[in-house]
């Protein structure tokens, strides 16, 4: 047997057991109204989906169930799932094989990128060097073709030839940047016939100059490697002079081969040119390397001189095989270098970079790991977001559909009659909603049917409410203005995605749940008194006495139950779109003293105001119970702050004197909002 403290939970709502309700307030036959199924008992009515509990004092406490709608997966859930998937993937990759993961990433992605950038820069350096090298060849050839230069091998030379040869050599030295000097060497004997190097001069007077023997100090390039008997110029890397040695053939007056003319061009001039062309950095050094037979050679950029000497054998071996691939070498200081080479016409140009440049630093590894985590998270989140919420699609369709529907209803009219428009829209409402739902998948209609109905109903109700109450001039608006208005209203009301269940849906749900509870009642529940008929006309004074007696008995039982019942009360939220009226309009019609409110119009008014929340707590008092609340010294002075008393958990009570009236109009909602909000 259940008593007044018997409760059970269903969903997210708290319900009082119907047996306890029957003991406090006998239930009788239901009455059906347009707003839902109502229950009558002793002249007081409430909605079927609202359960009545006794309060301390007179009256009844109405407990309104709150229906929780199923919501789609929101962004927060997607973020949590994405983070979890990312964490699992990163743990598997970076903790199971951290070294292999970074090594593979470096080998397949990072190293090719670095190598491509270095190779591109090296090709640019080679092109600039070749252009610089080719620019001076014509100047050297012109010097070799001079008669004064050709006659340098004659036994008896004219004074004017000696003077002109010296003058032309000085002009060449001043015009070619980085030109160290010029030598004319005999082919058969190591004799120097002309030189601009002061170290080569042994004796000089006004008529003649005596030069030393070529290669006397054993640091010059041997004659046999200068390209003897070769009619073509030859470029040699001279490590001792840190220069490019241009060896041109010297021909006699009759075209016979006589010797070689040597031009020494400094490598520093090449470095200065490359820096000016923005191909090298100022800190980059240029080191020459040449084979022992001077058949090939080149320059290395980016490594100190002392480091190159130890790398010379391995580097020259690669150059000799003409395999210009990436080469890893180690210096005497145990430093690993990566060498990139490129053939540039007459010689090879190589660039040396530390091997560490091809690997990740600890900071770079941390950055790569962070980027990988963020990228994985975004990919998983995008996969979870690929499928658009069907309700969002339906919302977009509603925005366009309602405007088109108005257009079809008013296609033949210049001025609008709002009642006619409303009638047409109401006529098409059910049919249109059915077609909308039919276009959605069957599984969606079954699982989220309430949300679909709520979304459709919310769209229609907001349009009607706004056109009727918020825009009183709708009758004079043209068709374009109506369409724009509907679009704005739907976009604002549906964009939030919070659809509220209509009254009928909530009432039906509560009916089903209450019927299930009644089926579970023991047989004793059937014997509860329910002989009060809604059509029975009782004397007003008898009804007052009956209600007061019931209230006193309920108060005693409620006090025994304790305050735990109130702690289960859900909050009833309200919102208003109406402007509060004067106090005289709030009370409606007057009634005789001692009357008890039992007209169904009271509940109809309340349900009309609370269109999506059909239940509220209405407390009736006799005249002597509320004179101190309703009346003042000079007569009735009802005010919102005095007539509405806020109770626990957001429910409220209105105390109305029978002299002031027994009907509540729609402005009762505005009165409630003025106090609670």
Swiss-Prot record:
Keyword annotations for this protein, in alphabetical order, are: Cell membrane, Membrane, Transmembrane, Transmembrane helix
Question: Does the keyword section mention Nucleotide-binding?
Answer: no
Subcellular location as annotated: Cell membrane
Q: Acidic residues bias: where?
A: 533-546
GO cellular component term of the entry, any = plasma membrane
**Membrane protein topology class:** Multi-pass membrane protein
The protein's predominant localisation is membrane
Is-annotated flag, keyword Signal? no
Region span, Disordered: 523-556
Q: Which domain of life is it from?
A: Bacteria
Q: Which residues cross the membrane?
A: 80-102, 338-360, 367-386
Name the record gives this protein: Uncharacterized protein TP_0593
